[in-house]
Amino acid sequence: MRYLTAGESHGPQLTAIIEGVPSNLPISIEEINEQLARRQKGHGRGRRMQIEKDQVKILSGVRHGYTTGAPITLVVENKDWTHWQGIMSAEPVEEGSEEKRRVSRPRPGHADLNGAIKYHQRDMRNILERSSARETTVRVAVGAVARQLLAQFGIRIGGQVLQINEIVAKRQEVSLDELIARTEESPVRCLDKEAEPLMMAAIDKAKEDGDSLGGTVEVIVEGVPIGLGSHVQWDRKLDGRLAQAIMSIQAFKGVEIGIGFEAAGLKGSQVHDEIVWNEETGYSRKTNRAGGLEGGMTTGMPVVVRGVMKPIPTLYKPLMSVDIDSREPFSASIERSDSCAVPAASVVAEAVVAWEIANAMCEKFPSDSLDDMEENVRQYRAYTEKF
């Protein structure tokens, strides 16, 4: 499978075209909209979330609730577009007009300056509109389609926030069902009820100070069969693809799988997961320090991926920058933004991980229809249990 997204933060809509989804997959628009609503929640979101009520429209590839095998077109309209029609118009406008609203002061930590230089743009709005994290809206919609495919095979996904700024949640061993239920009730998507109010207070203080906060999120995938991905070529390793997917999320600066960077300070005997076998489940591991991936392939254990999000670069008390017209120092430009988007980013992380796992399933079990894919998966799972 593959997909492309298009659209700007303040343009009329965000669009995704997905190709390669098997036919006869039941698609629920309500479930896609539920994921979009999850992305809009979270303590620390900005005023724009009071404007946007994201809802998906499916323009192709789904008929009467089922995929047809044709490309699927997803659209999410930007309600805020009504206030930006002149500024974001595709029609020419006069230089110096209000509609131009040119941006010449790049924000530290954003794509503004690098993109302007690369694409020969003197107006950095042409960069910031596309590089905005608003683009993740339609990626969550894409991920919601992937989740519905995975659900057909009993593969489930959950996520949580582990850290916001200096506040680190205490790790808790809970079932995926409990994790999903409890994080949905948390304004910061955190299991630790003691850390939750501290995180919220830190976000409020950052907002008061005109600053922003980052953090760490974790995604867990259960029910994944053994052998997704491959060891034979670098670009087919599933852990590499998952790392790229997480790092593709705006403002993410780090990723780890399983115990990740902790492994650097441990001995091999403390890192590797011992293999066990029984008649009911076949091969398994005593522990899951590898995070469900070894040699670029899934082990059958839960896939565990974490990502680090830096503080959002748009600050209401901006850092110093340089105006590209005068080359004089100025405070960087200000765009409406969140003070902390880590809870929302955990939903985005779930979406991009869902896509990669679903894509790996389609590669392992290539089928034009869901019916054929289900039979292929059934036979493979029976084979792995008897291996």
Curated annotation (Swiss-Prot):
Cofactor comment text: Reduced FMN (FMNH(2)).
Binding site for FMN: 130-132, 250-251, 295, 310-314, 336
Catalytic activities: 5-O-(1-carboxyvinyl)-3-phosphoshikimate = chorismate + phosphate
Alphabetical UniProt keywords: Amino-acid biosynthesis, Aromatic amino acid biosynthesis, FAD, Flavoprotein, FMN, Lyase, NADP
Protein's UniProt keywords contain NADP: yes
SUPFAM superfamilies (UniProt xref): Chorismate synthase, AroC
E.C. designation(s): 4.2.3.5
CDD domains linked to this entry: Chorismate_synthase
Function field: This reaction introduces a second double bond into the aromatic ring system.
Stored PANTHER family: CHORISMATE SYNTHASE (PTHR21085:SF0)
Protein name, per record: Chorismate synthase
